[in-house]
UniProtKB/Swiss-Prot annotation:
It catalyses: N(6)-dimethylallyladenosine(37) in tRNA + (sulfur carrier)-SH + AH2 + 2 S-adenosyl-L-methionine = 2-methylsulfanyl-N(6)-dimethylallyladenosine(37) in tRNA + (sulfur carrier)-H + 5'-deoxyadenosine + L-methionine + A + S-adenosyl-L-homocysteine + 2 H(+). CDD domains: Radical_SAM. [4Fe-4S] cluster 2 binds at C175, C179, C182. [4Fe-4S] cluster 1 binds at C24, C60, C97. Catalyzes the methylthiolation of N6-(dimethylallyl)adenosine (i(6)A), leading to the formation of 2-methylthio-N6-(dimethylallyl)adenosine (ms(2)i(6)A) at position 37 in tRNAs that read codons beginning with uridine. InterPro entries: Elp3/MiaA/NifB-like_rSAM, Methylthiotransferase, Methylthiotransferase_CS, Methylthiotransferase_N, Methylthiotransferase_N_sf, MiaB_methiolase, rSAM, rSAM_horseshoe. This is tRNA-2-methylthio-N(6)-dimethylallyladenosine synthase. GO terms for cellular component: cytosol. It comes from Bartonella bacilliformis (strain ATCC 35685 / KC583 / Herrer 020/F12,63). Residues 161-393 form the Radical SAM core domain.
């Protein structure tokens, strides 16, 4: 991996940065990498905004009123800044997808902001911050010509160890699907895939920092493609086989996937790789073919159901989660009933569900037949009740089983530890074990969103 250009920037001594992160796992990853870049310049992370010399708000633009939430935060930061003295000034920056979408508008509405940086430009954060410290207002939302990942410093080993034994690793960014409800193609750009070399190098850095479980990230992660050292074209399944060979790694996951890109090699990886956890987040959004077409999802409900069956045949113990949108423009009662029917057929271990909210710049925002808010609320309530019932059923179905659990942290009470089940849901155990070990745990009980277990008899 090439060394970061940020190393040419003079170090900044004894400064503290606080990053507030909204949104998806990739935003969490991006915030961590921003911290790495700033750490290389002498910044240390603080969990207290009042202690910070620099506050960054890393934003998400997926849901309704994302910009308003940002401006509300910025109003509070403005008051915090006014209380500062000249001996401890406060710099304020906005990053992420709202930064990309709003750009100069953020400075117009909130002049207290010093810099606005889009998700493809945060590798330049140290140099942009230096310019802002000299009094220049920064808006950098272009798409970088250079590969940003080649210009990020290596992971800060101590910071990785502090975060825990599970880590995210971005392998793919952007989306070319252009679903009519989604802003991702406009805020994250076209699909790009990181090289096998980059990914392997970063995975090794994480493993050397005691990470045991890596989740590969992408807006359309199973759209990843690359080349092996001998020039063969690889898809995500091939990459998983490759990473599974790394010494010290105990678990692999990936998210988020599009049904159209679930190819045979990826399904085979679920069948053949024990290191690949039996959990898959596979959004569908609706069970109505008419609505799926209006959303430009590029598949029908039966295609999704057939895919679920094929994956379950390959890995019978797999748990599925999904995404659902109710109240998309033109959705009728019959369309909604088709979604309910699909959920009943699949049986999810967990899921995310939302009311449709028009996103500026998307085709969905211009569609007629917008659904009444009360209807959306009623449908969402019914859908979430069904999904919650399925989650409870899934949790209870595991009682009495013994499964391997990755121990992640100490529990709330003395003598208690918390681990991660293969199905992603947490497990609370009254025992002691080193963080990072994988233990055989018998599930003895379940709450609404976690398991309770005990160390299995050997």
């Amino acid at each position: 991996m090439k060394q970061s250009n940020s190393k040419n920037t003079p170090p900044i001594a004894s400064k503290k940065v606080f990053i507030k992160t909204y949104g998806c796992q990739m935003n969490v990853y991006d915030s961590q990498r921003m911290n790495d870049s700033l750490s290389a310049q002498g910044y240390v992370t603080t969990q207290t905004p009042n202690d910070a010399d620099l506050i960054l708000v890393n934003t998400c633009h997926i849901r309704e009123k994302a910009a308003e939430k940002l401006y509300s935060d910025l109003g509070r930061l403005r008051m915090m800044r006014q209380k500062r003295t000249s001996e401890k000034p406060l710099m304020i920056g906005v990053t992420g997808c709202v930064a990309q979408a709003e750009g100069d508008e953020i400075l117009r509405r909130s002049p207290t902001v010093d810099l606005v940086v889009g998700p493809q430009m945060y590798h330049r954060l140290p140099e942009l911050l230096q310019q802002a410290q000299q009094g220049k207002k920064i808006v950098e939302t272009n798409y970088a010509v250079e590969d940003k990942f080649n210009h990020l410093p290596p992971h800060n080993k101590r910071a990785v160890q502090k975060r825990g034994v599970s880590a995210f690793l971005t392998v793919q960014e952007g989306c070319d699907k252009f679903c009519t409800f989604c802003v991702v193609p406009y805020t994250r750009g076209a699909e790009i895939s990181r090289s096998v070399e980059q990914i392997t190098d970063e995975a090794r850095q994480l493993i050397e920092a005691d990470v045991k479980e890596i989740t590969l990230l992408g807006q359309n992660v199973n759209g990843w493609h690359g080349q092996s050292t001998d020039g063969k074209t690889w898809r995500l399944g091939d990459l998983l086989y490759h990473l599974a060979k790394l010494d010290g790694l105990k678990r692999l996951r990936y998210t988020t996937s599009h049904p159209r890109d679930m190819d045979e090699s990826l399904i085979a990886a679920h069948r053949n790789l024990d290191i690949l956890m039996p959990y898959l987040h596979l959004p569908v959004q609706s069970g109505s073919d008419r609505i799926l077409k209006a959303m430009n999802r590029q598949h029908k409900a039966i295609d999704y159901l057939n895919l679920i069956e094929k994956i379950r045949t390959a890995r019978p113990d797999i748990a599925f989660s999904g995404d659902f949108i109710v109240g998309f423009p033109g959705e009728t009662d019959d369309d909604f009933e088709e979604t309910i029917k699909l959920i009943e057929q699949v049986g999810y271990s967990s899921a995310y569900s939302f009311k449709y909210s028009p996103r500026p710049g998307t085709l969905g925002a211009t569609m007629k037949n917008q659904v009444d808010e009360k209807v959306k609320n009623d449908r969402l309530q019914r859908l979430q009740a069904l999904l919650l019932d399925q989650q409870h059923r899934f949790l209870r179905s595991k009682i009495g089983q013994t499964t391997d659990v990755l121990i992640e942290k100490d529990g709330r009470h003395p003598g208690q530890i918390v681990g991660r089940s293969p199905w992603l849901l947490p497990v609370v155990v009254d025992t002691q074990a080193p963080i990072g070990t994988v233990m055989a745990i018998q599930i003895t009980n379940a709450s609404s969103n976690s398991f309770v277990g005990e160390k299995a008899n050997s």
